[in-house]
Amino acid sequence: MNTIRYTLLTVLTLISFHIFAQPGVSAGNLQFTIKKMSDNVTFGVFVKPDATIAPSKRTSTGSGQVTLVTSKDFTYDNLVSKGGTWVENARVNSPIEAPDNAYISFGFVTDEPKIKLQSNEETLLFTFVPADDYDGSISLIENNNDPFSTPNSYGTNPGNDLGMMDFGVAGGIQYYTYANNYFEGMDNGPAILASEKTEAAQPKAIFAAEKGTASLRSPK
């Protein structure tokens, strides 16, 4: 009976939290970044808790979205989910607001493999490999400043979002939401490969500091 009650509570809370945790929420506790992996070819999208929270192991993810901003000729292969299951669910090429850009959104489907948060550490969400001939930039959308942010000419909802609940902290259920992006030059800590339960320091990607975009050029 206790199991049934807990399951019902989880489902109902996730439904209500999904409504609350939408792209563009201005206050939150979770930060995203994108960088190259150790092979210098694959790109990874990571989440990290900010300094205000200390997540327990009893978290549950209810919603999520990651939107990449690339050149309009961008293509990729080998999308691999590492924390949660992610699928491409929208793409817009050359909108009038940013005709040189493409906006590719990846939606969260299920918390399998589970997204495991740890204080001051990165968790890898998914990876992908850009086409060999692509030499443009790849960055995460800035929800509040991008020219294609909602409302836009396509009536779409690009943006970054992650909504989680923590059942294991004192004081009752805690809610964590996406806050902003962070970039290289910060102390990112070790990465957590959620599906493999291993920790490995990630190499530094080359970023355009003023834009937070990852370059495909190899480090010199």
Model-derived regions: residue spans:
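Bacterial N-terminal signal peptides that target proteins for export
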Residues: 1-8
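Ser/Thr/Pro-rich, low-complexity mucin-like regions
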Residues: 117-173
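Boundary/junction segments of secreted and surface-exposed precursor proteins
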Residues: 21-42, 177, 183-220
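A structural detector for beta-sheet-dominated domains
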Residues: 33-37, 46-48, 69-71, 107-109, ...
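The transition from N-terminal targeting/processing segments to the mature protein
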Residues: 47, 57-59, 79-99, 117, ...
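Structured beta-strand segments within beta-sheet-rich domains
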Residues: 46-47, 89-137
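Low-complexity, serine/threonine/proline/glycine-rich extracellular segments that form mucin-like
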Residues: 26-31, 35-91
